[in-house]
A protein has these predicted regions:
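Conserved, mostly hydrophobic/aromatic
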Residues: 61, 267, 336
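Active-site or pore-adjacent capping/gating segments
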Residues: 293-355
Length: 355
């Protein structure tokens, strides 16, 4: 046995080559019309966060995409609502393909697109990129969470707004990644509710960074960045309770300003702010609408987890997707469609009242 064989990859079962980001982009190109939509809506998000556009950013959609057909039906409905409220809201659809797990579980469409534990990542990458192309072709901009540093090379050119989640905001890898991403990025506060990790992350990502990554041709590369000027903070609640109330928002905005960061922020109506109760999300959205209507300037955006069917269902990877209810989440419980349309109307009305 060679010496290297005695010490390397002892717990690795196999390596499977994947197409490079450039190869997948050539197969599924962004196209001029989609690229124009992405560029325009990224600039609109930037202007909203800076207070130059008085609309509200609303990032809304399924907790995760597991069924592309149902996701496209949702997108078709959402684009109608986005057009209805276009003078008051910039609606961006959640298109989340990677899910962080506290222990184990389904890791998302990219990792396991067949929902059966087969981990066909090549198909997952292809499905994710195709889905983003289909949604943007409808005129609907897309948002996603960036969970690791390789997959963005396959999808980021089709993404208008990105998030770094509560479990990864403190990670140096994700701060470095965000510094080089081409779209506005929001960092969630920590799972314990602490805000400082998000402040530190936003500051770090706005600065130039150098790190190990991959280039479009798939080669390992030294990546040097200019820093991302469009970083912000997302209040999502935490172990110590919700943080969407007027005092929470005001204090967070003051801390952002004191740190020299964008003082306007995004509030997540789900997760710790709803106690993971999808019914409670609608109540949180209504309370945020009241803050906005009362003239609160710190809230630039709201996040909602929403699907065609309310609630959630358990995915059994041993069975696969055959028994699943179409349009219902297999991860976090979501608001149903009717509640979503109502929440969007309330948020739009709050913007009009604030003017």
């Amino acid at each position: 046995m060679d010496t290297i064989d005695a010490t390397a990859d002892l717990h690795v079962a196999s390596f499977t080559a994947l197409p490079s980001p450039a190869e997948l982009a050539s197969e599924l190109p962004v196209g001029d019309e989609r690229a124009a939509l992405v560029a325009r809506t990224r600039e609109e998000v930037r202007a909203i966060m800076a207070g130059e556009d008085d609309r509200l950013l609303v990032v809304v959609g399924p907790c995760s995409i597991h069924d592309a057909d149902a996701g496209l039906e949702y997108a078709g409905r959402l684009v109608v609502e986005a057009e209805r409220h276009r003078d008051d809201l910039l609606v961006v659809m959640r298109t989340y393909f990677e899910k962080p797990r506290t222990t184990v579980g389904w890791k998302g469409l990219i990792n396991d697109p067949h929902l059966d534990g087969s981990h066909d990542i090549e198909t997952g990458l292809r499905l994710a990129r195709a889905f983003l192309r289909d949604v943007t072709a409808l005129g609907m901009p897309c948002a996603t969470e960036f969970l690791e540093p390789i997959s963005p090379q396959y999808t980021a050119d089709l993404v208008t707004w990105g998030a770094i989640g509560a479990r990864t905001t403190e990670s140096q890898i994700h701060r470095q990644l965000a510094s080089g991403l081409s779209m506005p990025i929001g960092f969630k506060n920590g799972t314990d509710g602490g805000l400082q990790v998000a402040l530190d992350a936003a500051a770090a990502a706005s600065a130039p960074q150098a790190f190990l990554g991959i280039a479009a041709d798939g080669r390992a590369s030294l990546v040097t960045t200019t820093g991302n000027p469009d970083t912000s903070v997302i209040l999502r609640g935490g172990a110590d309770g919700p943080n969407y109330g007027p005092d929470h928002v005001r204090r967070a905005s003051e801390r952002l300003a004191a740190a020299g960061l964008t003082s306007r922020l995004v509030v997540d109506a789900s997760h710790g702010n709803s106690g993971k109760d999808h019914v409670r999300q609608a109540e949180v959205a209504a309370e945020l609408a009241a803050q906005i209507a009362d003239g609160g300037q710190a809230i630039a955006g709201v996040m909602l987890e929403s699907n065609l069917v309310a609630g959630a269902q358990k995915l059994d990877v041993a069975v696969g997707p055959a028994a699943l209810v179409r349009g219902q989440s297999v991860t976090d419980a979501c608001m149903g469609w009717d509640a979503t349309a109502t929440a969007l109307a309330q948020l739009a009305e709050s913007v009009r009242r604030s003017r």
